[in-house]
Amino acid sequence: MEIKFKKMHGTGNDFIMIYYEDYPFEQHFNQLAKEVCHRHFGIGADGLMIVKESSVADVQMKYFNSDGSEAGMCGNGIRCFAKFVYDEGLVKKEIFTVETLSGVKELQVATVEEKVSSVRVNMGKMVLDPKQIPVNSEGLQFINEQLMIDGEKYTISTVLLGVPHTIIFMETLDLDRVKRVGKIIENHQLFPENTNVNFAQIINQNTIRVRTWERGAGYTLACGTGVSSVCGIANHLSLVGPNVVVEIEGGKLDIEIAPEGDIYMEGPAKDICKGVYLNSLIK
């Protein structure tokens, strides 16, 4: 079976977009994500996004990590999703809503020559309750807790912003450490549904550098929910102000923390290529 697709990226975090109508076999979405996202045997991407009609928003986004697991939200992905549905004419307004597993998100697109160049997303408010994240903890929140990994002590904080995110503030960022420790914490028994892991370096009151190990995807060049969570907890701890530029390996993202607690993320979304995937699941 042939499936039309478009490949896109948001600051280096790359995704495959397909229409639900072109592949309405929900029982195969998990396996399809594994296949198309494979860097050697598929198209290659961090995740698969499926565009579907919604009864509660302008459009629905179903998101699957490269390991086939479904996720409630993806910050860089939803920017690419917004560009896709706007550029394809599925929505015709610059402010619209997207249904996700973590709720309805409001987005605003900026256009150049009638094509989306950047997207601003209301990521919502951080959830601090360990039971909702979830974290195996009896406290009211899980902030600045100590965790031993391979004989080293790490101070970690975990929040829910669509998906679980664990934040570790470091003096310097070491990619080998990010990959080694990130994988261990992702699968730690503290987190019954696993967790994303963000290593953050405070540059100044308005700038943070972040590297992320994503749950279900591994190391990625960018993570929108991750940088939003980092800024949210950094602001909560008075480490940064309400407006932050986040430096990630794939570029930069702008984060604003509103007085009421909503976190806004703004950044680019770009097309890479489009084509036809020769799927092996459905003949």
From Swiss-Prot:
Which residues are named in the active-site annotation?
74, 223
Which pathway does the protein contribute to? Amino-acid biosynthesis; L-lysine biosynthesis via DAP pathway; DL-2,6-diaminopimelate from LL-2,6-diaminopimelate: step 1/1
PROSITE patterns associated with the record: DAP_EPIMERASE
Q: Which GO terms describe its molecular function?
A: diaminopimelate epimerase activity
**Which is one Pfam family of this protein?**
DAP_epimerase
Localization terms from the record: Cytoplasm
E.C. number(s) listed in UniProt: 5.1.1.7
Q: GO CC terms on record?
A: cytosol
Question: Where mainly found?
Answer: cytoplasm
Q: Which reaction does it catalyse?
A: (2S,6S)-2,6-diaminopimelate = meso-2,6-diaminopimelate
Q: Which example biological process does GO assign this protein?
A: lysine biosynthetic process via diaminopimelate
Identify the residue position(s) of the site Could be important to modulate the pK values of the two catalytic cysteine residues. Answer: 165, 214
Annotated keywords: Amino-acid biosynthesis, Cytoplasm, Isomerase, Lysine biosynthesis
Isomerase found in the keyword field: yes
Enzyme class label: isomerase
Q: Which residues bind substrate?
A: 13, 65, 75-76, 196, 214-215, 224-225
Describe, as the record does, how this protein assembles with itself and its partners: Homodimer.
Give the function comment from the record.
Catalyzes the stereoinversion of LL-2,6-diaminopimelate (L,L-DAP) to meso-diaminopimelate (meso-DAP), a precursor of L-lysine and an essential component of the bacterial peptidoglycan.
- Alphabetized PANTHER family for the sequence: DIAMINOPIMELATE EPIMERASE, DIAMINOPIMELATE EPIMERASE, CHLOROPLASTIC
Q: Which family does it belong to?
A: Belongs to the diaminopimelate epimerase family.
Q: Supply the name of the protein.
A: Diaminopimelate epimerase
- What organism does the UniProt record list as the source? Alkaliphilus metalliredigens (strain QYMF)
The taxonomy runs: Bacteria, Bacillati, Bacillota, Clostridia, Peptostreptococcales
